[in-house]
């Protein structure tokens, strides 16, 4: 259990695409989310420079959220912290190792919220500055538990 999980050896010089899977993720703070930041040349970018657009689907309907000045990009939305209120999902990250391009991500997750309501969440995020991304930080305001896996995909 930790509030932060860092991936600093992502071999961004080898892989064009990175793929996270999240299985049975729990957060200790009710209605918290799992968020993502990038390391640029070894330093975490924590400024309000990220952009994202998200569609949320739940039993009450649909909603949209977006930002052009966030300090993170989302991965998993507002899960509950009770038994069986786990979150599952995935995130693709593109162009991390290419200092001439912006770094993009897409994500999709499902969870039971604190009410508990079933929730599906999908969208995309952007670091709109050309930089060498060489690591990823996943974080939450409370402890994170569950299984997080990172895979590299190489183009030929």
What are these regions (language model features)?
Residues 1-156:
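Surface-exposed molecular-recognition determinants
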């Amino acid at each position: 259990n930790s509030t932060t999980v860092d991936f600093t050896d992502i071999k961004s010089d080898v892989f064009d695409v990175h793929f996270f899977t999240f299985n049975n993720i729990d957060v200790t703070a009710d209605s918290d989310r799992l968020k993502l930041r990038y390391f640029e040349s070894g330093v975490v970018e924590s400024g309000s420079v990220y952009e994202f657009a998200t569609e949320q689907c739940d039993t009450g309907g649909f909603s949209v959220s977006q930002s052009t000045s966030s300090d993170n990009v989302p991965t998993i939305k507002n899960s509950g912290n009770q038994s069986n209120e786990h979150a599952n999902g995935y995130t693709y990250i593109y162009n991390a190792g290419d200092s001439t391009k912006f770094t993009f991500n897409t994500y999709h997750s499902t969870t039971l919220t604190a009410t508990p309501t079933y929730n599906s969440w999908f969208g995309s995020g952007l670091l709109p500055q050309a930089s060498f991304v060489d690591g990823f930080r996943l974080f939450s305001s409370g402890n994170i538990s569950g299984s997080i896996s990172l895979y590299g995909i190489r183009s030929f």
